[in-house]
Each structure stands twice: as C-alpha cells, then as structure tokens.
C-alpha cells in the first residue's frame, strides 16, 4: 500500500468503523484533474447504495476538514464486489485457492501483469500458481490485485 493510501486509511477507518462497516481498502488514483479516491466498505449484512451514500457523506466531511488531498478529486464509496481488490496479506490469505490478477509496480521477468491461482501467503509474500510454476511476490511490490470470479457452466 502506498504511503498516501495508508495515511488516508488511517483518517477514514475510524469513521467507517463507527458507522458499523469494515474498511476493506482505500485506493487513491492520482490522475491530474481526474483524480479519484475509492473507498471499499464491507458488512456481514451486505452493502447497499444507501450505505455507500451515508459513508460518503460522513467521510467527505472529515476529508473537507482534514484536507489530506490537494486539488480536486472524485470520492467513490463502494462494496468490494465479486472482483474485489486485495490490499492486505490477511485478505490474500482468505482468498487462497481463488483466481487473481496481480499488477506489479516494477516488471518481473519482463512483465508486470500476472493471472493465476492464489496458492497462499508466506511471510510478506503472496504465492501465485501460473502455467505450472509458482511465483512469489512481496506484498510491497504489488501495485494492484483483484479476485477474478470463476463461473461454472
């Protein structure tokens, strides 16, 4: 997780938790005038559009006061969904056996994108089975990771 994301998470998490939700993750995408702050929330009872709107209002108030992001940005609050992003080692461990897409911050063996079966977590590395090989990636080298839903015919 980037330093900016970690700082935003520390600011946002108490608000989300106080509202009865779990903060699944925070993703700040700096793209000039089109920057986005995406907050993923989860609940045992599920997440509705009204839940997202309520969290958005509360978090927006905190962000307006604390002002951790310079310039304009769009705030989005969402459930993680079926193709949920993975941010922490605990999240990776809980999706062991699932298919995942991983994008690295720097190339490994000439490429940055990998898709395969999540074999587990060892220390601070995730293990990925791909084309009969096992790859180990330190969590800090992962720029993005998502679960790839599998549908049976």
Curated annotation (Swiss-Prot):
Pfam families: DUF150_C, RimP_N. It comes from Chromohalobacter salexigens (strain ATCC BAA-138 / DSM 3043 / CIP 106854 / NCIMB 13768 / 1H11). Its main location: cytoplasm. It is found in: Cytoplasm. Keywords: Cytoplasm, Ribosome biogenesis. Required for maturation of 30S ribosomal subunits. Belongs to the RimP family. GO terms for cellular component: cytosol. This is Ribosome maturation factor RimP. The keyword Cytoplasm applies. One of its GO terms (biological process) is ribosomal small subunit assembly.
